[in-house]
From Swiss-Prot:
Gene Ontology cellular-component terms listed: chromosome, centromeric region; Ndc80 complex; nucleus
Example GO biological process: attachment of mitotic spindle microtubules to kinetochore
One MF term in the entry's GO annotations: microtubule binding
Coiled coil: 329-492, 582-689
Entry protein name: Probable kinetochore protein ndc80
Function according to Swiss-Prot or TrEMBL: Acts as a component of the essential kinetochore-associated NDC80 complex, which is required for chromosome segregation and spindle checkpoint activity.
Database matches in InterPro entries: Kinetochore_Ndc80, Ndc80_CH, Ndc80_sf
Region named Disordered: 20-151
Gene name, Swiss-Prot/TrEMBL: ndc80
Cellular compartment(s): Nucleus; Chromosome, Centromere, Kinetochore
Family affiliation: Belongs to the NDC80/HEC1 family.
Principal place of residence: nucleus
Keyword list, A-Z: Cell cycle, Cell division, Centromere, Chromosome, Coiled coil, Kinetochore, Mitosis, Nucleus
Ranges of biased composition (kind: Polar residues): 20-73, 108-129
Length: 738
């Protein structure tokens, strides 16, 4: 029978959460962190392959989850690749009918009952991690610790620090009925010089606060190291079995810090269970209400599902889930009522604003008519401006023309006066020579004829010379173009390693072009001689005095023959090298793109850290202002006391010693208040950061546990369906063999 892979499989044998891997991101308490760093000694990051595949129940919607994804290069001692979380049915420790259910969620993954007895974790927080690293990492998760034994930054050797954390631990044990539950009494000196029995009882009680279903069955030196490693205690490498067997003496500060860390972890889990971190998550934009509803559904449904027997049918098992599904739907509807009310208010505001817009549109004048009239006026204005500019240009043009004509008139009048004077002079000279009018006409006619003949000869000579110079200039231009082409060819040959013949691509061939032309001759001097109309450039254009160059003799290489074939072969070779270069370039570009993507991821990580730094600075400034205010108040109080002291000194000389003692006490109290304010500021600052880190990491842990179980259920269904198909295929084959 086919089933939806997104739902629980009711048909297969029941199994617990024991085979679900534990990728816990349980955070450190504030006392285990350095004051100067808010991200040091954190949990190992996940890899980038972790994504949500599908919901456990497709019929119920789930709100969008925040994705604080960052790149990482490793897990906590595991390979950085994808962790194998897909397991076969045989890997379940409770697959057989003989396996029992020792707890609500027994948590070890084994293939036989013997290994099950060794792995007896019962809480969802105590499953050992057997896979690789995961990828959905918040920027609040911890980074991998450095190689070697990490150094504890807490001043555990300080007597005052020991007294403080011991008092906090003692108060926590007293307020939570330690003596009643463990039937072991505590004294004021229990946490100063404890016995081995005191440590064992306190450790077991604190761990039961974290994992109530765990049972201690071995000696403490064998139980404590795996538990600390599983809880990811940052300094568990510095604790040996021999030290656990003798916790007193010099080793006690280390174990006192470890017990205080367990206490803070238990307190954090209690606060998270009571929802004290929900407001902080909401302020950061993370809605955990939906996660709480789904978690309550999963825990309740899984608990009821475990109550059924192995022989319970599918319908009865499905009926067990119906009340939980209905309750989850009701809780989601109740949570969505706030958003529905906000939507209704926004819809009402939207309708009111739309009504106002419509009213304003009705009362407003016709904008289309006004726009049309405005465009017409703009066109008229532009036309008048163009007309004014045109008329102004014509005025300037006519004024300049009038001035020019007046100058021409004055020049013409002066020339006319000079011509009249010349005519009068010529007439006087003719009268003195005694020439007649006929003689003058004949001489003028002869002069005109000779002048015309000279002009014709000169014009023909000029035309011939012009044609010669044009041809010469054309030939010179062609020669210069040819020289430029030869120079360009040789330059390209040098650039492409073809010239000289010893170049890389020449292969012993000569590719350098040269022109077989004469050089300019500067031996003939024309100084003092008859000027020649033939330029010296003509010497380079002629191979002989009256013969030019033959095209085949002008160049020293056969371009169309040998050179062209060699260049074609070289071009093919270069094309092949170019293709190989393009392929290599594409590979390098792909590598560059990958590097850019990695840089973008690192840049986003830096931005997240910068945002976190700014938040810490704002918190520091706020605490600084509070401390400053307190200090000012203390200063005012001190000044007031000093005035009273001076007054009392003036009036009562017999109480001088008493007032001096009071002043000393006041100063001591002021110093204590200052120290206490500084300590309180640091503690609050660290606690705020730790709370935010803890709740986000714990949320990621819960989410990942659900996702792993979802993937496990999907794999089991796929394997079950695959097994049914294989059985159907084997049956016909057996029949044929018979």
């Amino acid at each position: 029978m086919s089933q939806d892979t997104g739902l629980f499989s009711i048909k297969r044998p029941r199994e617990t959460l024991g085979s679900v891997q534990n990728f816990s991101s349980l955070p450190q308490p504030s006392s285990a962190l350095k004051r100067t760093s808010s991200i040091g000694y954190q949990n190992p990051p996940f890899t980038s392959q972790h994504t949500r595949s599908m919901s456990l129940l497709n019929s119920v919607g789930r709100p969008q989850q925040p994705n604080f994804q960052r790149s990482s290069s490793g897990g906590f001692g595991a390979d950085p690749g994808l962790s194998s979380v897909r397991r076969s049915v045989s890997s379940n420790v409770f697959h057989g009918t003989s396996a029992g259910r020792p707890s609500f969620a027994p948590g070890s993954m084994s293939s036989n009952p013997a290994s099950q007895s060794l792995q007896r974790r019962s809480s969802v927080f105590s499953r050992p991690s057997t896979g690789g690293a995961m990828g959905h990492q918040s920027f609040f998760t911890q980074v991998p610790s450095a190689a070697g034994v990490p150094r504890d930054p807490r001043p555990l050797r300080d007597r005052s620090f020991q007294a403080r954390i011991a008092q906090e631990l003692l108060e926590y044990l007293t307020h939570n009925n330690f003596e009643l539950e463990m039937k072991h009494s505590l004294g004021q000196n229990t946490l100063r010089s404890p016995t081995q029995k005191d440590f064992n009882y306190i450790f077991q009680w604190l761990y039961h606060r974290i994992d109530p279903g765990y049972r201690f069955q071995k000696a403490m030196d064998a139980e404590v190291p795996p538990i600390l490693k599983q809880l990811r205690y940052p300094y568990e490498k510095g604790i040996t079995k021999s030290q656990i067997a003798a916790v007193g003496g010099q080793n006690w500060p280390t174990f006192l810090g470890m017990l205080h860390w367990l206490m803070e972890l238990a307190q954090m889990m209690d606060r998270f269970a009571m929802g004290e971190y929900d407001e902080a998550c909401a302020e950061m934009g993370v809605d955990v209400s939906g996660d709480r509803i789904i978690f309550r559904f999963l825990t309740g449904a899984y608990h009821d599902w475990l109550q059924g027997g192995e022989e319970e049918d599918d319908d009865a098992a499905a009926q067990r889930l119906i009340p939980h599904i209905e309750l989850m739907a009701q809780e989601f509807e109740k949570g969505n009522e706030k958003y529905v009310q906000e939507m209704q208010v926004l819809d009402a505001e939207n309708r009111a604003l739309r009504d106002q817009i419509e009213e304003l549109e009705k009362n407003a004048p016709d904008m289309a008519k006004l726009d049309k009239q405005f465009r017409i006026l703009e066109d008229d204005k532009r036309k008048f401006e163009d007309y004014i500019q045109n008329v102004q240009g014509k005025i300037e043009k006519y004024e300049s023309r009038i001035a020019f004509l007046e100058d021409e008139i004055r020049k013409t009048e002066s020339e006319l006066q000079a011509a009249e004077e010349e005519r009068a002079g010529l007439q006087a000279s003719v009268d003195q020579q005694g020439l007649t009018i006929q003689d003058i006409d004949r001489m003028n006619t002869e002069r005109d004829r000779l002048q015309r003949s000279l002009d014709d000869a000169v014009s023909r000579l000029e035309e011939t010379h012009a044609r010669v110079m044009a041809k010469e200039s054309e030939a010179s231009a062609k020669l210069e173009d040819l020289e430029e082409l030869v120079k360009t060819y040789n330059t390209l040959g040098y650039q492409n390693s073809l010239i000289p013949s010893t170049a890389v691509n020449a292969n012993g061939q000569e590719y350098e072009l040269g022109l077989n032309v004469n050089e300019r001759s500067f031996s003939t001097s024309q100084i003092g001689g008859i000027p020649s109309r033939i330029s010296p450039e003509a010497d380079r254009l002629l191979a002989e005095p009256f013969t030019g160059y033959h095209p085949a003799h002008l160049l020293n290489l056969d371009l169309r023959g040998i050179v062209r074939s060699n260049l074609q072969a070289l071009r093919k070779e270069i094309n092949e090298r170019r293709k190989r270069g393009i392929d290599a370039d594409l590979e390098r570009r792909n590598l560059l793109d990958n590097i850019k993507e990695a840089m973008d991821e690192k840049r986003s990580e830096v931005e997240a850290l910068e945002h976190k730094r700014r938040t810490a600075e704002e918190e520091f400034e706020r605490l600084k202002e509070v401390t400053t205010t307190q200090k000012l108040a203390s200063d005012a109080q001190i000044e007031k006391m000093e005035k009273e002291l001076a007054k009392m000194r003036a009036t009562m000389s017999e109480s001088v010693q008493l007032m001096e003692q009071r002043e000393m006490n006041t100063n001591i109290e002021y110093e204590q208040l200052t120290l206490r304010a500084n300590a309180l500021r640091e503690e609050l600052h660290t606690n705020v950061e730790s709370m935010l880190n803890d709740v986000i990491r714990f949320k990621v842990h819960i989410q990942k546990g659900l996702e792993d179980y979802e993937n496990f259920v999907v794999d089991e269904v796929e394997q079950e369906l695959g097994g049914d198909t294989q059985l159907d295929e084997d049956a016909p084959m057996s029949t044929e063999e018979l």
